[in-house]
Amino acid sequence: MKAVIFAYHDMGCQGVQAVLDAGYDIAAIFTHADNPAENTFFGSVSRLAAGLGIPVYAPDNVNHPIWVDRIAELAPDIIFSFYYRNLLSEEILHLAPAGAFNLHGSLLPAYRGRAPLNWVLVNGESETGVTLHRMVKRADAGEIVASQRVAIAQDDVALTLHHKLCQAARQLLNSILPTMKCGDIPSVPQRESDATYYGRRRPEDGLIDWHKPVSTVHNLVRAVAAPWPGAFSYNGSQKFTIWSSRICPDAQGALPGSVISVSPLRVACADGALEIITGQAGDGITVQGSQLAQTLGLVAGARLNRPPATSGKRRIRVLILGVNGFIGNHLTERLLNEENYEVYGMDIGSNAISRFLLHPRFHFVEGDISIHSEWIEYHVKKCDVVLPLVAIATPIEYTRNPLRVFELDFEENLRIIRYCVKYRKRVVFPSTSEVYGMCTDASFDEDKSNLIVGPVNKPRWIYSVSKQLLDRVIWAYGEKEGLRFTLFRPFNWMGPRLDSLNAARIGSSRAITQLILNLVEGTPIKLIDGGQQKRCFTDIRDGIEALFRIIVNDGDRCDGKIINIGNPDNEASIQELATLLLDSFDKHPLRCHFPPFAGFQVVESRSYYGKGYQDVAHRKPSIDNARRCLGWEPSIAMRDTVEETLDFFLRSVDVAERAS
């Protein structure tokens, strides 16, 4: 059986050798060129392949049509991936009649994604393993062929566990590859309800928070011990790395981060003390804990600390236009939770952001983007990342005020985009799920799905086409003038501060707010055209975390990308949403303050929105780009989101209004 292998790292070497030992004919091996900035402590697949006389390649983009054609010419019967770092396209996966199979370093479906070796130690797991699974478009989600468990000892660190996993992988492959070669390939679907997903880890993730439990700090030390970058802290401005540690249960009442003793070197955590066995100051040598204390000049009672803001670097300045809106105020909260961000914002109101107005890293001006163009241009020039979030985004306004929608959503935002081009600033632009229009795909793919809208005499499409045209203009500026951009497409985000009941009273709100108003006022819940339209509802916390990761832009992976942000698992019709909302309303402790439920009322869309309206039957995102670029997976169930949103609005109704 002819195989093509994609491999890297020690696991790649183990995989290649196991495939050879099982009697496969390896037509070619694809690997990566080593990164000079990376600590390459592991075996070289390219050297192994060269020594075996097997053709080996390291293309920058193996999914390029040229390489797809070359792999097709090899006519593989089967494809294996052993710790190859890039996802393979569906075109490649479909080239092998027997299928494509990946070796993953966890017991799937747990710990999908990146760095499972480190994450299981961070989380204090007692068991992990390796899994061989069929490759599908979605990373780590294919049917399981075989797996092998590995116990994690309390004294295991990243390197010892790595060696255990390599040994387990070799045993697993030795047992299953001969069977697969005979055409007998086991296939067990993964249970999606048990799936967990983890993203890439960065060196800066090793920063110790001494306010965490001592077991958490110790597990972090284990997870990133050499040859990984290490867990670290600061004494004043001096950085030091902890390479090994042990848990001491008694912190002697000391505050977290306090040095309890220097010989042995022990530091207080939230519920105990960490004894530092070995470590190093700055770029020095590794020494025992007591010598490290001498080097750092530590004495009992000294307090270790977090680094100076951004380790001496200027904070990242984020400009949010429409900062008082639903996305803007939640994003502001997320950014201000990080020390290295400063937020500048403008909006015509400040009710939702009042809690930030005295924050030293929040700078707000009340104003209209269509008037304060000089302020906006100055702050685009001043800031690092620009988010133009101002838009009219409620369906009834598309038919009521189509020209105003075009003027604000397109013309005003185009001016901001041109400022970003002029001053070479990165823009994170809110596209919309509406751009997909009446697309017939089962799930909407950012890079492949057609964008289909209705006729000109249906003004409800003015919002969709305004956003779509801006998407295309931004893309063109990126291609022709080097604009750094990311387009994100929210799919029905919900949560507290979504909009207001007053907006719902004039019909200018999102669907759930309108439904809540009906319950609050004791009026019938209106189901437009029966409420059978399906949407995928996404919790604002999930959405904001994805958006935050776009702003962080780890490894510049979001540059030039379009990213859907939605929860495909939370698909429900508007009628189902209303039923769930009613159930939550009846169970709410404030239920007794509101009128009886007035029932459901089916209403034609024409009578509600006007003759210019046209609806879509479903809107479901593919989130593969978000998984790949952000290491992100939505996790919050729709019921939780509905209950939190309902609670926020019910508690916003004052007592007198409830009684009336």
Swiss-Prot record:
Pathway: Nucleotide-sugar biosynthesis; UDP-4-deoxy-4-formamido-beta-L-arabinose biosynthesis; UDP-4-deoxy-4-formamido-beta-L-arabinose from UDP-alpha-D-glucuronate: step 1/3; Nucleotide-sugar biosynthesis; UDP-4-deoxy-4-formamido-beta-L-arabinose biosynthesis; UDP-4-deoxy-4-formamido-beta-L-arabinose from UDP-alpha-D-glucuronate: step 3/3; Bacterial outer membrane biogenesis; lipopolysaccharide biosynthesis. Its EC number is 2.1.2.13, 1.1.1.305. It catalyses: UDP-alpha-D-glucuronate + NAD(+) = UDP-beta-L-threo-pentopyranos-4-ulose + CO2 + NADH; UDP-4-amino-4-deoxy-beta-L-arabinose + (6R)-10-formyltetrahydrofolate = UDP-4-deoxy-4-formamido-beta-L-arabinose + (6S)-5,6,7,8-tetrahydrofolate + H(+). The keyword Transferase applies. The record marks 102 as: Transition state stabilizer. UDP-alpha-D-glucuronate binds at residues 393, 398, 432-433, 460, 492, 526-535, 613. GO terms for cellular component: membrane. The active site is at residues 104, 434, 619. Keywords: Antibiotic resistance, Lipid A biosynthesis, Lipid biosynthesis, Lipid metabolism, Lipopolysaccharide biosynthesis, Multifunctional enzyme, NAD, Oxidoreductase, Transferase. (6R)-10-formyltetrahydrofolate binds at residues 114, 136-140. Residues 314-660 are annotated as: Dehydrogenase ArnADH. Bifunctional enzyme that catalyzes the oxidative decarboxylation of UDP-glucuronic acid (UDP-GlcUA) to UDP-4-keto-arabinose (UDP-Ara4O) and the addition of a formyl group to UDP-4-amino-4-deoxy-L-arabinose (UDP-L-Ara4N) to form UDP-L-4-formamido-arabinose (UDP-L-Ara4FN). The modified arabinose is attached to lipid A and is required for resistance to polymyxin and cationic antimicrobial peptides. This is Bifunctional polymyxin resistance protein ArnA. It comes from Salmonella paratyphi B (strain ATCC BAA-1250 / SPB7). The lineage of its organism: Bacteria, Pseudomonadati, Pseudomonadota, Gammaproteobacteria, Enterobacterales. The gene is arnA.
